[in-house]
Each structure stands twice: as C-alpha cells, then as structure tokens.
Amino acid sequence: MAAITASMVAELRGKTDAPMMECKKALTEAGGDMAKAEELLRIKLGTKAGKAAARITAEGVVACHIDGTRGALIEVNSETDFVSKNDSFLQLARAAAELVARHQPADIAALGALAYEQDGFGPTLEDVRKGLIGKIGENMVLRRFRYFGAGHRLVSYLHGTRIGVVVEFDGDATVAKDVAMHIAAMKPVALSSAGVPAELIAAERSVAAAKAAEDKARAEAEGRPVQSDDIVAKRIEGAVHKYLKDVALFNQAFVKNDKQTVEQVLKAAGTTVKGFALYVVGEGMEKKVDDFAAEVAAQVAAAKAAVT
C-alpha cells in the first residue's frame, strides 16, 4: 500500500472540507487512492464532503467572445499561475475565443489550423501556441471550447479569468446577466432536472444507498432499531431529489433573492434561457501536488552529501 503523506491528506481536505483525521482514515482505507478516498468521505460525511470539489488547482484562463448572436467560451491551460497572467498567453486565449466565434471549428485540431499570427509566430493558431511554448518555456494547451450560434441573444460573465459563463436567452438582458452571475456562483450542471446526466444521478443514488447501508450496519452493531426497506428507499430518493434541486438551474434559489427560484425570476421578467456553458479553469483535471517539506529535506540532504 502506498504511504499516506501529509500532502495527500492536505489535498483530500482541500477537495472535501473533511477533518484531517477523517481524510487520513479514508486514504488509508482506500490504499492511497485519492478518488476512492473522496468517495468514502462522501458516504461517511454526506454531501458536505463534496462542497469543496470546485477548488480546482490546474492553472490557465477562461476567455469568451460574443459578436451578435454568435459567441464562444474557451479554456486554455498553462502549467503555472505565473504564465496564466502573461500578456502573450492572455492574448492567445482571447484570440482563440474570437476564432471559435467567427469560424465554428469542429474540434481543437480544426481550431489550431485556423489562420492567426502573434508575437512573430504563425501562420496558424497552433503555430503560435507552439512558438509561445518555446518562448515562455512552459506548456500551454487549448483544452475545450463551446460555440454558440443558434440565433438567440447571448450574454457573458467572467469572474476574473478562472470562471466563465455564456448564456443563450431571449428577453431581458439585465436579468440574463444576473443569471450568468448566478451560474458562476452556484455551478448548475443543467437547465432542469430532466437535463441532469443519468450518470450523475446514478452516482448520487449510489452514494445515498451506501450511506444508508452504513447507517444500518451501525444501528445493528449498536443494538438500535433498523429503518425499514421502505423508509430507506424513500430516504435515498429524497437525497436524489435534493441533489436535482441543487444542480438544476431552474430549481435553484436565485442568489440575488433566495425567496424565488431562477425559474420564477425568469418568468416574472418574461425571459427564457435556452442554454448555457460554464467553464471553471482546471475542472476535472489533476495537478501535481508537491510535498514542499520533503523537497526541502531532499535538498538539505543533497547539500550535506556534497559537503562530505
């Protein structure tokens, strides 16, 4: 089994907000598997273990470009936060978003093949990317993009350079902008419950079932009454219902007025949201977590060895 290091415990705590000892126990039980340990914590501690899942550590920027009813949202990644603030890197990201909006490329490869020159590099976007890698000395990747061109109005919201939202709508632009800000804050995964991916619902049901099974085993061990299968089933479905309410945009309480749902706010304003895209830099990506203490210790040991 892999040794459980302090940096692993810290990483898991950063992802889950769980107590340090619980993180260590989960990692030990999972044999050092970070994903499995996170799942174990969700079962043991409930939904609060997933609240910090959006604390993404990969670097880069999100950029957008809107031109009338055409627009684009794109994520461009770098290795360090320092490079993500580099002017040439930022220019590349903004240019890539504009190229997507103008040309509607089929994929990243098609985007890279589009004509573009910057900083003496070209004649394609991919050539510029490779040139900047050599110039700056750090890898950078055009990770993903979303094109909008269905003929609806568009509005965007950028929270710094790490969170970006584009909303397709018909109606009041001010309300649509507020909804874009809401999406950045609340991070829904779909417009309505019907649009939530089946695999996410299945995963949530699995976590709720595992939590119920653990509670049953604990009750039996302690000699307490065990919930009936009917109650357990209702409990599991209740957890799924709550999850759908939490992650479907229309069901969410509006951030600027939690007495109303987003759906109610839109209806009152005569506005409809047709779709949206939300990008968070590094979402779903792994990033190397350096054990700084171990690194320093290794450097000290190497220095001592050099002296002797």
Curated annotation (Swiss-Prot):
Keywords: Cytoplasm, Elongation factor, Protein biosynthesis
Coiled coil: none
Ranges where the record places region Involved in Mg(2+) ion dislocation from EF-Tu: 80-83
Entry's Gene Ontology cellular component terms: cytoplasm
Family assignment from sequence similarity: Belongs to the EF-Ts family.
Function: Associates with the EF-Tu.GDP complex and induces the exchange of GDP to GTP. It remains bound to the aminoacyl-tRNA.EF-Tu.GTP complex up to the GTP hydrolysis stage on the ribosome.
Protein name as it appears in the record: Elongation factor Ts
UniProt source species: Verminephrobacter eiseniae (strain EF01-2)
